Amino acid sequence: MWLAAAVPSLARRLLLLGPPPPPLLLLLSRSSRRRRRLHSLGLAAMPEKRPFERLPAEVSPINYSLCLKPDLLDFTFEGKLEAAAQVRQATNQIVMNCADIDIITASYAPEGDEEIHATGFNYQNEDEKVTLSFPSTLQTGTGTLKIDFVGELNDKMKGFYRSRYTTPAGEVRYAAVTQFEATDARRAFPCWDEPAIKATFDISLVVPKDRVALSNMNVIDRKPYPDDENLVEVKFARTPVMSTYLVAFVVGEYDFVETRSKDGVCVRVYTPVGKAEQGKFALEVAAKTLPFYKDYFNVPYPLPKIDLIAIADFAAGAMENWGLVTYRETALLIDPKNSCSSSRQWVALVVGHELAHQWFGNLVTMEWWTHLWLNEGFASWIEYLCVDHCFPEYDIWTQFVSADYTRAQELDALDNSHPIEVSVGHPSEVDEIFDAISYSKGASVIRMLHDYIGDKDFKKGMNMYLTKFQQKNAATEDLWESLESASGKPIAAVMNTWTKQMGFPLIYVEAEQVEDDRVLKLSQKKFCASGPYGGEDCPQWMVPITISTSEDPNQAKLKILMDKPEMSVVLKNVKPDQWVKLNLGTVGFYRTQYSSAMLESLLPGIRDLSLPPVDRLGLQNDLFSLARAGIISTVEVLKVMEAFVNEPNYTVWSDLSCNLGILSTLLSHTDFYEEIQEFVKDVFSPIGERLGWDPKPGEGHLDALLRGLVLGKLGKAGHKATLEEARRRFKEHVEGKQILSADLRSPVYLTVLKHGDGATLDIMLKLHKQADMQEEKNRIERVLGATLSPELIQKVLTFALSEEVRPQDTVSVIGGVAGGSKHGRKAAWKFIKDNWEELHNRYQGGFLISRLIKLSVEGFAVDKMAGEVKAFFESHPAPSAERTIQQCCENILLNAAWLKRDADSIHQYLLQRKTSPPSV
């Protein structure tokens, strides 16, 4: 047990933040030097935007009547499109989106007039468009556009593609499935593939009679196909007015479980054959979620059914197609015996996210991809609200701070970040903005806005917005207008500072006791990962600030809107011995830098747990980020981390673990990596001893998550007792004597692999091959990179591209190798360069290529590696990953600067701890 009186005041040893920060000129010059390095490598600015024009407005669709006939053996499909169209301006051509499709014939028949056959199809492959030319002018009015076409069921996990699966009998077969967001409906049928060009859809599928056929709407007819007795034609009801990216169809073999929500919507979860039981948890979540959203928005779900389906090969986590939501198997299926607690939580969040889109995105759709964040930021916020409603025991809002809020701040502090509202055009640019800014920063600023407005007015404003724009398109300004009308607050003025400029502020705060009151002096400056902002015109934010005190740590004593660079506020009746903290609940999207006296007063609240968990987390994370930026010393943050010895909260430990992982990766470039592992063992051993290996009576979801986290951290660091017990339990698991609980498998697998040999890896690969559940395969794939032997690392990398690993999971295997060790990082980067053509062809410019690059290179910490990465991608372009590459190179330079700045002092501190360890 650690007592406050056992050591000198921790904050006095810190010399952490003041008196005020180091001389400004020194910091500015340091920051300027970093920025000059970025410029010298050409990393300071994104490449020029590619030329792009949206579709002309002369012709637009009213209704698509679409029939598709996929061939699941030859991997082709035939299509017939009859589109009711409106000619708004006389023209002799129709421009549509079209990619990887061959048009056979096309014609246009004005209403009540003769058919006009197109005389030419001009494909603009770079722009993914086709121009249909006609011999005479199409006059204004309505008519029918007919197109016959053929395409390939590709293996790129986009458009209309094939998904490989194995039947219970062991036979390999293929399903035909879709993934259209953002710009891939054009790979399934010629269309006006922009979110604002909405229409209704009548969809028919011609499929083998023993296959399941699904689309957005319910089946209204199923009849034999006249040309082949083995086929049937399945017709679906007409959809509401909707965008092309939300259209979906699936053809394959599936079982399902079903129920009805309390408001009468038919809910089904489709699973691989024989695994219907694994769909029950998601079914339960979906059946609770639909009524929750209906009540929250006060707008009913507009379709008669909602299907959730698990797809074997799937690039994203899930996709919100209206009425037919597609998922990775690991984001939907839960095995009561073999799924871990984190998987159940993940499924609940993903289901909550995708069903929120049925209103926010599907019923009301962004006008253009600039406003993507309206879809994704909102869904990424309200998924937590939904899960908190369904599973209050998850303490999910604390987890939000670690999973989304801090992740967004990490990215948004870079020079190569982007505003939430970002101008995009070419499809490759659209793919780039599916990132932590659109999702996690979007969610974080909505959370801040919700807190600023209050739940009652927020719900009122949401109802106004959804009602006004249902079946239409909207822009960010439309949402602000509705919320402003509901709340009477200056929403647009406040939020424009958060969505139209990138970055966020660092709030510096000092306090002075004046009789019975506390006077706070606040100032804001842009927070930069490279150090204090050195530009002349520093951006400003309108910052909703909440202030709490130790008198009532869970309630705001004062709420203000900071609308200027500096201001002072007075807290009435605050005693000299009471602490004051900014950002109650870590809700405001900013970082806080306290004067040394204020920080000293807060640290006992970490030790005695009087600070709420989410505030303990936020305080630690702010300090760590200030250290990464060179504003404070990393050593002082390590000292603060030691104050968490009594910490009971899973999410606080998770954030600590993440930050120590970042530091461990940095120090893997030094010769004292083992010393930081000793520090990790010292910090995590007490909580590990308290938890033990086996659940205790009365424990719940968060205890299970914490146990797995702590044992994994100790095992990876080489904690002797943990390693021995992991090996014992692994041996019994492999021999079938005592099967590991699902919550212990990841930490045990990680531990034995990290400290194992070739035989251990062979056993793990055998377990992978035998696993019937994708969750178990993924669990193994994610830890394979922990192996340390160069020969075994190469074996894992080769395995990553084998047929044993699903295409979307190759990324996590290679990324795991890069994150596993210094040698693994070098080997993974070489492997990517050597196999670039295959990898790039596999992912075809989707967001998985960005994730692969990010996971593989951003852990480097040598300046020259930034130049090497940049040079490679200049000669091997990855258009959809340009921003990611810039960000990775920037992070490499930042890591190098951090290492040069703090490595010696960290080493000295760790050595000092060996000779005189802290009394904890």
Curated annotation (Swiss-Prot):
Q: How is its activity regulated?
A: Strongly inhibited by bestatin, leuhistin, actinonin, amastatin, 1,10-phenanthroline, DFP, PCMBS, Zn(2+), Cd(2+), Co(2+), Cu(2+), Hg(2+), EDTA and puromycin. Not inhibited by PMSF, and only slightly inhibited by leupeptin and aprotinin. Activity is increased by Mg(2+) and Ca(2+).
UniProt-annotated binding residues for substrate: 181, 317-321
Q: Which InterPro entries match?
A: Aminopeptidase_N-like_N, Aminopeptidase_N-like_N_sf, ERAP1-like_C_dom, M1_APN-typ, Peptidase_M1, Peptidase_M1_aminopeptidases, Peptidase_M1_dom, Peptidase_M4/M1_CTD_sf
> Which Enzyme Commission numbers does its entry carry?
3.4.11.14
Q: Would the keyword DNA-binding be found if you checked this record's keyword annotation?
A: no
Span(s) of short sequence motif Nuclear localization signal: 727-731
User: One Pfam family of this protein, by short name?
Assistant: Peptidase_M1
Its GO biological process annotations read:
cellular response to hypoxia; proteolysis
Q: How is the cofactor bound?
A: Binds 1 zinc ion per subunit.
Superkingdom, according to UniProt? Eukaryota
Q: Which residues carry this modification: 3'-nitrotyrosine?
A: 465
For this UniProt entry, the molecular function terms from Gene Ontology, in alphabetical order, are:
alanyl aminopeptidase activity; metallopeptidase activity; zinc ion binding
Disulfide bridge partners, by residue number: none
Name its co-factor(s): Zn(2+)
Subunit relationships:
Monomer.
Name the record gives this protein: Puromycin-sensitive aminopeptidase
Organism annotation? Mus musculus
